Curated annotation (Swiss-Prot):
Subcellular location: Nucleus
PANTHER family: F-BOX-LIKE_WD REPEAT-CONTAINING PROTEIN TBL1X, WD40 REPEAT PROTEIN
GO molecular function: histone binding; identical protein binding; transcription cis-regulatory region binding; transcription corepressor activity
Effect of Y509C: In CHNG8; uncertain significance; no effect on protein expression
GO biological process per UniProt: negative regulation of transcription by RNA polymerase II; positive regulation of canonical Wnt signaling pathway; positive regulation of DNA-templated transcription; positive regulation of transcription by RNA polymerase II; proteasome-mediated ubiquitin-dependent protein catabolic process; protein stabilization; proteolysis; regulation of transcription by RNA polymerase II
WD repeat windows: 230-269, 286-325, 327-366, 369-409, 410-449, 452-500, 503-542, 544-576
Cross-link Glycyl lysine isopeptide (Lys-Gly) (interchain with G-Cter in SUMO2), where in sequence: K340
Gene name in the database record: TBL1X
The protein's name in its UniProt record: F-box-like/WD repeat-containing protein TBL1X
Similarity comment: Belongs to the WD repeat EBI family.
Residue span of region Disordered: 177-202
Keywords: Acetylation, Activator, Congenital hypothyroidism, Deafness, Disease variant, Isopeptide bond, Nucleus, Phosphoprotein, Repeat, Transcription, Transcription regulation, Ubl conjugation, Ubl conjugation pathway, WD repeat
Quaternary structure annotation from Swiss-Prot or TrEMBL: Homotetramer; dimer of dimers. Component of the N-Cor repressor complex, at least composed of NCOR1, NCOR2, HDAC3, TBL1X, TBL1R, CORO2A and GPS2. Interacts with GPS2 (when sumoylated); leading to protect GPS2 against degradation by the proteasome. Component of a E3 ubiquitin ligase complex containing UBE2D1, SIAH1, CACYBP/SIP, SKP1, APC and TBL1X. Probably part of other corepressor complexes, that do not contain NCOR1 and NCOR2. Interacts with histones H2B, H3a and H4. Interacts with MECP2; recruits TBL1X to the heterochromatin foci. Interacts with USP44.
């Protein structure tokens, strides 16, 4: 049968930008209608035996989930809004991962079966199952065309077999009259042909792409990996508590969870389930929306979460809901505490950013400066922050100011992530335009325009080294993760790439430095977490999980790495000797 890449929850990838979605949006435009209402589509098989009804809401939801699972976060948000996913009555927690891929695969198998069956219901004699690509299967008259091609090939094979039989009979007759010396030469030639034929077949079988084999010397043994299960959908994010071994995770099952991995916890790891609910008819009911962002405050006493339901929430470390923050008019994409712990900053698909008072839960100020969804935010200090958007702009805003104090323009596609360096002097940004740019508040244009990746750059991280860090004697570095399957380390002072890390085989969605800056963790949709030496660029540890990796993070001591995955699992890697 046909094998689809991504038949599991680890789906294939394409660029996360808006351009990658145009064909999908166009294809389903007729089903949604301009207002995104639900329509019924009556379908039947080509021969008219079976009929069924499919609503456009159902189609839209499966496409939306596929985009999320594939890592197309920006496109998923846009598509969800345009198709009014939030207004549908579909309970997303009941839909299994990779549902769209699964139903497409079943459709392919149905077409393959049709090709193998005659009009009268009998199976072609000796016919192998025909392997199709998805594009082959949607072509007009594919069944009739493939059946006709098979009949012609079968006729040729029968004619060739008859000719070969006649030739063999003639050769056998001639062999009885030839000399013994000549007859001894032929078997050697025949044996050589047989051996070469087997070699050729073996070569063709082994010529398929395989997952990279992990070197046994760097592979993290299963005894050092703890797999935490409990989430019922993909886990988009995870973050360690800054003072203890509590790992928070956020999922498409509308929950966040706090996993206790402290050595003194009884019975191994335990989990607290933080259910994200909304008020309906005087009752709290599950929101059925993804938890898209989370962040611990500096002293580790409070956890903030952002959800696709448009609400930010503050939780205590023991799992109690402390506050619900509601002013965004759509999904929340990013959320950050300031260092002091008195404000929370959020970015929304409603094109705004909001500073919240963490104590009262009130919005201190809303900043409506972007012309498209805001994708990321980062604090420069306790009252000043930067935000980026699909509008290709970066704004630097300050609490109390009614306009941006600085606007950086230069990217030619949506800006995916922004990060201030530890000193707050330099701002790094990465974009779907495949560039990494470094900005200074002292000038209008970027001070570095770094162009080395050949696909979209999804995220960036500064090392915790250099001035204003606990590792002042180590040089500062910047790491970038791209859809080209590579991670790059940069010397920002010189504006050069010092290492290109190339072991991943799928887009890389997350990178994180160890607290001392000596190691870098990377997570990719190839299901692998790699640990690299930042000085040499060498791979020192590697782990292959069971789902595509969305996020990686280090605990405060630097001896454990957490990773969240598309199959609903959360992995904890113990790097102690």
């Amino acid at each position: 049968m046909t094998e689809l890449a991504g038949a599991s929850s680890s789906c294939c990838h394409r660029p996360a930008g808006r351009g990658a979605m145009q064909s999908v949006l166009h294809h389903f435009q007729r089903l949604r209608g301009r207002e995104g209402g639900s329509h019924f589509i009556n379908t039947s098989s080509p021969r008219g035996e079976a009929k069924m009804s499919i609503t456009s809401d159902e189609v839209n939801f499966l496409v939306y989930r596929y985009l999320q699972e594939s890592g197309f976060s920006h496109s998923a948000f846009t598509f969800g809004i345009e198709s009014h996913i939030s207004q549908s009555n579909i309970n997303g927690t009941l839909v299994p991962p990779a549902a769209l891929i699964s139903i497409l695969q079943k459709g392919l198998q149905y077409v393959e079966a049709e090709i193998s069956i005659n009009e009268d219901g009998t199976v072609f004699d000796g016919r192998p199952i025909e392997s199709l690509s998805l594009i082959d299967a949607v072509m007009p008259d594919v069944v009739q065309t493939r059946q006709q091609a098979f009949r012609e090939k079968l006729a040729q094979q029968q004619a060739s077999a008859a000719a070969a039989a006649a030739a063999a009979t003639a050769a056998a007759t001639a062999a009885t009259t030839t000399s013994a010396g000549v007859s001894h030469q032929n078997p050697s030639k025949n044996r050589e042909a047989t051996v070469n034929g087997e070699e050729n077949r073996a070569h063709s079988v082994n010529n398929h792409a395989k997952p990279m084999e992990i070197d046994g010397e760097v592979e993290i043994p299963s005894s050092k990996a703890t797999v935490l299960r409990g989430h019922e959908s993909e886990v988009f994010i995870c973050a360690w508590n800054p003072v203890s071994d509590l790992l928070a995770s956020g999922s498409g099952d509308s929950t966040a969870r706090i996993w206790n991995l402290n050595e003194n916890s009884n019975g191994g790891s335990t989990q607290l389930v933080l259910r994200h609910c909304i008020r309906e008819g005087g009752h709290d009911v599950p929101s059925n929306k993804d938890v898209t962002s989370l962040d611990w405050n500096t002293n580790g006493t409070l956890l903030a979460t952002g959800s696709y339901d448009g609400f930010a929430r503050i939780w205590t470390e023991d799992g109690n809901l402390a506050s619900t923050l509601g002013q965004h008019k759509g999904p929340i994409f990013a959320l950050k505490w300031n260092r002091k712990g008195n404000y929370i900053l959020s970015a929304g698909v409603d094109k705004t950013t909001i500073i919240w008072d963490a104590h009262t839960g009130e919005a201190k100020q809303q900043f409506p400066f972007h012309s498209a969804p805001a994708l990321d935010v980062d604090w420069q200090n306790n009252t000043t922050f930067a935000s980026c958007s699909t509008d290709m702009c970066i704004h630097v805003c300050r609490l109390g100011c009614d306009r941006p104090v600085k606007t950086f323009q230069g990217h030619t596609n949506e800006v995916n992530a922004i990060k201030w360096d530890p000193s707050g002097m330099l701002l790094a940004s990465c974009s779907d335009d495949m560039t990494l740019k470094i900005w200074s508040m002292k000038q209008e244009v970027c001070i570095h325009d770094l162009q080395a990746h050949n696909k979209e750059i999804y995220t960036i991280k500064w090392s915790p080294t250099g001035p204003a860090t606990s590792n002042p004697n180590s040089n500062i570095m910047l790491a970038s993760a791209s859809f080209d399957s590579t991670v790059r380390l940069w010397d920002i002072e010189r504006g050069v790439c010092t290492h290109t890390l190339t072991k991943h085989q799928e887009p890389v969605y997350s990178v994180a430095f160890s607290p001392d800056g000596k190691y870098l963790a990377s997570g990719s949709f190839d299901k692998c977490v790699h640990i690299w030496n930042t000085q040499s660029g060498n791979l020192v540890h590697s782990y292959r999980g069971t789902g595509g990796i969305f996020e990686v993070c280090w605990n405060a001591r630097g001896d454990k790495v957490g990773a969240s995955a598309s199959d609903g699992s959360v992995c904890v890697l113990d790097l102690r000797k």
